[in-house]
Amino acid sequence: MKSAIRFVLTLLLLHGSIDADDVSASPPLKEARSDYFVIYTTAHAGPSPSKVLTLCEELRSELCRVWGLAHRAKKWDPLCEIVVHTSAASYLASVGPEAAQTRGCSRIELHNGKVSRRRIDLQMDVDGSLSALAHELTHVVLADRFHGKPPAHWLDEGIATLADSRAKQLLHERDCQDALSSGHALPLQQLLNLEGFTSPAQMPAFYGQSLSLVSMLARQRTPQQLIDFAVDARDSGYPFALKKHYNINSVAELDVKWRAHAKASRHVGPSSPVLIASLRP
């Protein structure tokens, strides 16, 4: 299942979301806090909030380490709200019916160049696990690095997918290869600038290509340099950032290199992308 992420550039809340003051309303909730998180779980059926808090702290530290953000890991203000739902009805009441095919939804609000709200809603899996947590927390961790602007959609989703299970990654890799074989792969000029889908048919190719491109660029240099590249691309454009970080002269040249990489990957079989092994279930 795909995740959902919402970047909001105002202080207004989307219809159906829960304010922090409302999470203590019915049903009763348990709570745990740290310098980064406030965890809410259902009192009678939910997991231990302290255990969820420990997992969140471990994941945040590992994400910061892998992506070179540890030196930027200041105390979050506001804290990231993590709301664990034990039923689909509760989850969808918070995130909206459009997220019915997801297990997690992250919400990041930006105001005056700063993050003004962080929130993740999670639907607990049947076995009691939180399979969407690592993916959604990746979005929240990355948000602080982009100078009060949303990161590019391809980068945000590609990196978050690296925190998914290998089984999910293989499905995205299959979609990427299918798009290339059928001629429906998105040109990278379109992929790099795509912020919204014009057709549901774009989605499999987008997610598959995003994972493939993120993996290629992170391997070619380092995961940390990929983040620096993305920040420069956001602030100064892709031609400048590609030349500075990868000695690539244009998006067109990147497209050629990526297609060659994807073709080679098809022949050698599935290979593990940049490892965040400790985040995988």
What residue ranges belong to the model's regions?
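Histidine-centered active-site/metal-ligand motif
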Residues: 15, 135, 139, 157
